């Protein structure tokens, strides 16, 4: 009986440490107060890059990412044509883009990246979108994506 209780406690402890999301080891989310200065700098850069993409919906002018801001994969995928398609859809459905609200940073221990979650605020109250910016160890954006908003990270 003791072994069973100890085993259950050990499994519970290990299960709370990290979780697997799509085969990747994801640590606990980090609040704004727990972030280091490096994480804070990455958060600011992620905010600026994400805001630049969504502000394109209001201004129709997109400044392409440079090699110091994003990986080659992100630069190739973020063409003005692709962003324009997304912006047309979002402008019709959600109205004008207002701002990004930082929610959390989730460290991805598998590939040593940080995932920054922002809630995208639009003109219409029904807009419930999330912007995720993944920053790698070189302080470059390695992924930028939008999803429907969910309170829990998936």
Q: Residues of each region from the PLM?
A:
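Short helix-adjacent coil turns
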Residues: 57-65
């Amino acid at each position: 009986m003791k072994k069973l209780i100890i085993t259950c406690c050990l499994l519970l402890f290990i299960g709370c440490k990290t979780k697997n999301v799509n085969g990747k080891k994801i640590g606990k989310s980090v609040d704004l107060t727990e972030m280091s200065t490096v994480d804070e700098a990455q958060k600011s850069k992620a905010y600026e890059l994400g805001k630049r993409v969504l502000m394109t919906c209001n201004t129709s002018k997109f400044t392409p990412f440079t090699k110091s801001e994003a990986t080659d994969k992100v630069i190739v995928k973020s063409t003005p044509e692709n962003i324009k398609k997304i912006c047309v859809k979002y402008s019709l459905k959600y109205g004008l883009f207002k701002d990004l609200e930082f929610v959390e940073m989730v460290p991805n221990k598998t590939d040593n990246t940080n995932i920054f979650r922002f809630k995208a605020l639009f003109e219409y109250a029904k807009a419930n979108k999330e912007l995720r910016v993944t920053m790698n160890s070189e302080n470059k954006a390695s992924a930028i994506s939008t999803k429907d908003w969910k309170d829990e990270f998936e």
